[in-house]
């Protein structure tokens, strides 16, 4: 049975915390690879802030080019309408029945998981790996993990990783305000954003 990590999100833009989470999950769960899956149209985010999917895809390619166990897939771009994790996991588990999928989420998403579309399918079809931002979050997160595991017979675990306080929203705001985003994300991604005038 292969073990593959899935890193979903808009990646608008991708930054070092995304990469740090993926690498930590790869190591801690002995995964064969991590697949980055950018969303086409997430149901919960305003489309006005979202740059075109081909640019977000290319920025991921730039960011992961030096990591042999990272790859990126555009499978969610080919679906009409909003993008839902449940649909993606149903498609993946049907296509790859001999693979165990580990879906990597931030700690904030753990507390929103039951509000997702068909959360029971998400928790049935994949191990959920939830990243804690720091030790003080552990008790709350572990309590929530126990609650969801019991309620949904889920396989949720805590991913312990040193975290920086960086978000895609923060980077978009810094660009808009003319502030530097150097050292928050790979240099190739920063150059691509500047070249195309994104987030101004």
Swiss-Prot record:
Gene3D superfamilies xref list: HUPs
EC number from the UniProt entry: 2.7.7.18
Top EC group: transferase
Gene Ontology terms: biological process: NAD biosynthetic process
Recorded GO MF terms: ATP binding; nicotinate-nucleotide adenylyltransferase activity
CDD domains named among the record's database cross-references: NMNAT
Pfam families to which the protein is assigned, alphabetical: CTP_transf_like (PF01467)
Keywords annotated in UniProt: ATP-binding, NAD, Nucleotide-binding, Nucleotidyltransferase, Pyridine nucleotide biosynthesis, Transferase
Pathway the protein acts in: Cofactor biosynthesis; NAD(+) biosynthesis; deamido-NAD(+) from nicotinate D-ribonucleotide: step 1/1
Reactions it catalyzes: nicotinate beta-D-ribonucleotide + ATP + H(+) = deamido-NAD(+) + diphosphate
Function: Catalyzes the reversible adenylation of nicotinate mononucleotide (NaMN) to nicotinic acid adenine dinucleotide (NaAD).
NCBIfam families assigned to the protein according to its UniProt record, in alphabetical order: cyt_tran_rel (TIGR00125), nicotinate (nicotinamide) nucleotide adenylyltransferase (TIGR00482), PRK00071.1-3 (NF000840)
Family: Belongs to the NadD family.
Protein name: Probable nicotinate-nucleotide adenylyltransferase
Gene assigned in the entry: nadD
């Amino acid at each position: 049975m292969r073990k593959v990590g899935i890193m979903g999100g808009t990646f608008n833009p991708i930054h070092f915390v995304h990469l740090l989470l993926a690498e930590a999950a790869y190591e801690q769960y002995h995964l064969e690879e991590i697949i980055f899956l950018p969303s086409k149209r997430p149901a919960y985010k305003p489309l006005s802030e979202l740059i075109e999917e081909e640019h977000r895809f290319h920025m991921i390619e730039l960011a992961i080019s030096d990591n042999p166990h990272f790859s990126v897939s555009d499978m969610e771009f080919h679906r009409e309408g909003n993008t839902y994790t449940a649909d993606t996991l149903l498609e993946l588990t049907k296509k790859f029945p001999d693979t165990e999928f580990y879906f990597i989420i931030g700690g904030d998403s753990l507390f929103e998981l039951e509000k997702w579309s068909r959360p029971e399918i998400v928790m049935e079809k994949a191990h959920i790996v939830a990243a804690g931002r720091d030790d003080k979050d552990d008790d709350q997160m572990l309590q929530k993990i126990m609650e969801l595991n019991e309620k949904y017979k889920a396989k949720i675990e805590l991913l312990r990783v040193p975290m920086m306080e960086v978000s895609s929203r923060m980077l978009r705001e810094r660009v808009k305000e003319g502030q530097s985003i150097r050292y928050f994300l790979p240099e190739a991604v920063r150059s691509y954003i500047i070249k195309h005038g994104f987030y101004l």
